[in-house]
UniProtKB/Swiss-Prot annotation:
Belongs to the glutathione peroxidase family. The active site is at C56. It is an enzyme of class 1 (oxidoreductase). The keyword Iron-sulfur does not apply. It is found in: Secreted. Keywords: Oxidoreductase, Peroxidase, Secreted, Signal. It comes from the Eukaryota. This is Glutathione peroxidase 7. Its EC number is 1.11.1.9. InterPro entries: Glut_perox_Gpx7 (IPR013376), Glutathione_peroxidase (IPR000889), GPX_AS (IPR029759), GPX_CS (IPR029760), Thioredoxin-like_sf (IPR036249).
Amino acid sequence: MVAAVATAWLLLWAAACAQSEQDFYDFKAVNIRGKLVSLEKYRGSVSLVVNVASECGFTDQNYRALQQLQRDLGPHHFNVLAFPCNQFGQQEPDTNREIENFARRTYSVSFPMFSKIAVTGTGAHPAFKYLTQTSGKEPTWNFWKYLVDPDGKVVGAWDPTVPVAEIKPRITEQVMKLILRKREDL
C-alpha cells in the first residue's frame, strides 16, 4: 500500500515537472494559409507574439511598428508571430485569406501570420494559455504583446497601450544576448 501511494506521488510529481518544462515552442498552430506549423521552428530566435485585428483603433500604429521591427531585427534572430483574433469588439471578422491580403497589401507584412484563434477563455489556443499562465497577464484587447526568448520562456508582456517603440530596447537586448550566445558557441 505504501509503495503504491509512493509510486502515485512520484508519477504526479513527474507529470508536474514535465508540465513546468513546457515552453512556447512546444506548441503547434495553423498558419494563415491553413498549414499546421510546429512553433519549434522558431526555437533559437526571439519572438514577439501578438494577437492582431484588422479593424481596431490600434491596427495602423501596431502593424506599421511590428513590420518595421521585423525589418530591423528579423528574420534570423527575431520574428513577430501574429495571431488574428476576433474576441475583442469583433474587430477581426474576415476570413484568414482576407486578413492575410489586408496585412500584406496595406502594411507589406513579412512576418509569420497564423489562422484566427481565440486567445482567452476555455477555447483559447494552448499557446496563448501558456503565454497567459506564465506571464500572469491575459489579453483584454487586441495587440497584446508577449516577448518569448530563444528557449521559449516568456520574458515580457505588454498591453496594447504600450507602443512597440517603447519595448523595442527590451527586444533588441534579447536579440543581442542571443547573438552573443551564438558567437560564444562557435
